[in-house]
Amino acid sequence: MSVVILGPLSEGGIKLPLYLFQVPAGFASPAVDYIEKHVSLDELAEVRAPHVYLAKILGDSMIGAGIFDKDLIVVDRSRTAEHGEIVVAALNNSDPICKRLFMMDGVVKLQSENSAYPSKHILEGDNLVIWGVVNYSMRRHGKA
């Protein structure tokens, strides 16, 4: 699964209403008119420019993690990646890819979340560059 880097997010942004209720997928809530506060998508997605950027997913190797083809991901370059986190990384100067980072007992690999794709084992001498940790993913549901 490769990614297309879209660039950093801007500072600031438009504030949207945040309702103080969870949205059920069944019956509507009687609290639909209660606004808790206004927040920006930057605040909700923990965007802290300039080290956070958006990337577009290409492919289906991360569907088991809920990340699908053409989703947008919010990537934080300031975080140190830990075992089990989803990262954007480049292996041996290749194009960046989105995978789950596996680091345990001296084994390091970039793991797909789709059994149709093999994991990429990091071997001695390989050059692994972590471009950032994925904090959020976003998917368009409506028509463009």
Regions found by a protein language model. Give the residues of each.
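Structural motif
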Residues: 70-71, 85
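Short, positionally conserved secondary-structure boundary motifs
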Residues: 1-63, 96, 103-107, 118, ...
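Flexible, small-/acidic-enriched active-site or ligand-binding loops
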Residues: 114-121
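A short glycine-leucine-enriched loop at secondary-structure breakpoints
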Residues: 64-68
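SH3/SH3-like beta-barrel fold
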Residues: 110-112
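Short, compositionally biased
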Residues: 83-108
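Hydrophobic beta-strand signal
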Residues: 74-75, 88
